[in-house]
């Protein structure tokens, strides 16, 4: 049974993409895959690693934040990144580096980002957040600062006049905070996205 719900889908019908650095001739049996510390990215990356290794490739995994990932791919220091949220969430990175990257395909169509609360929380929309500021301690628990969802949440705070502070953390820290709050039946609002395993717990 799901224990959380999305109260504000800031972007709907996003596409999760894979891209590679331009100019790869495909002859090398070595490949480096960059990934951010997000659950779906870790899963996809390790699955890809196993598949590449089964095909005889020597695979190197590179964990980093988004800005270094895009820089590394554009400079051919890494070959593949499988967790690009388009068209809006990572738009700025694609504008900056897109001419040096090659999109090779969609992984998931219909991705969403937004704000997430436990299902026992009695609000159902972003407009209701200010009225319950004290119960949420005036905080939205986010992930790493360079993530597109953080920029989108900052914009939502302005657009909806939310009297909240967006807290920077990480994907694992955000889900740990969510679990801790659910275990205590505390009110919490976090940045969230689908697909993500937290919606299936």
Residue map of PLM features:
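Short helix-initiation/N-cap motifs at beta->coil->alpha
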Residues: 38-39, 60-72, 167-177
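C-terminal motif of bacterial Sec signal peptides marking the signal peptidase cleavage site
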Residues: 18-21
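Ligand-binding cleft/hinge of the Venus flytrap
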Residues: 48-56, 131-166
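A conserved helix-loop-strand patch within extracytoplasmic ligand-binding domains
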Residues: 98-146
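Short, well-ordered beta-strand elements
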Residues: 27-40, 48, 57-62, 137-141
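Bacterial N-terminal signal peptides that target proteins for export
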Residues: 1-8
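Ligand-binding pocket segment of bilobal, Venus flytrap-like solute-binding proteins
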Residues: 79-82, 149-201
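Pocket-flanking alpha-helical
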Residues: 45, 65-98, 176-181, 197-201
């Amino acid at each position: 049974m799901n224990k959380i719900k999305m109260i504000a889908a800031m972007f709907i019908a996003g596409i999760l993409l894979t891209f590679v650095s331009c100019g790869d001739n495909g002859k090398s049996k070595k490949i480096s895959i960059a990934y951010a510390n997000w659950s779906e990215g870790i899963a996809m990356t390790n699955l890809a690693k196993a598949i590449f290794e089964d095909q005889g490739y020597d695979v190197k995994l590179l964990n980093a934040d988004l800005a270094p990932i895009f820089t590394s791919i554009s400079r051919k220091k890494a070959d593949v990144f499988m967790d690009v949220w388009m068209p809006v969430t990572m738009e700025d990175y694609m504008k900056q580096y897109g001419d040096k990257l090659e999109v090779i395909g969609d992984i998931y169509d219909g991705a969403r980002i937004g704000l997430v609360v436990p299902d026992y929380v009695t609000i159902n929309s972003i407009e209701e957040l200010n009225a319950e500021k004290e119960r949420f301690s005036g905080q939205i628990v986010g992930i790493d600062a360079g993530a597109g969802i953080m920029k989108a949440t900052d914009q939502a705070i302005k657009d909806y006049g939310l009297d909240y502070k967006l807290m920077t953390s990480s994907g694992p820290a955000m889900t740990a905070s969510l679990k801790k709050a659910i275990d205590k039946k505390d009110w919490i609002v976090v940045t969230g996205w689908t697909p993500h395993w937290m919606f299936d717990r």
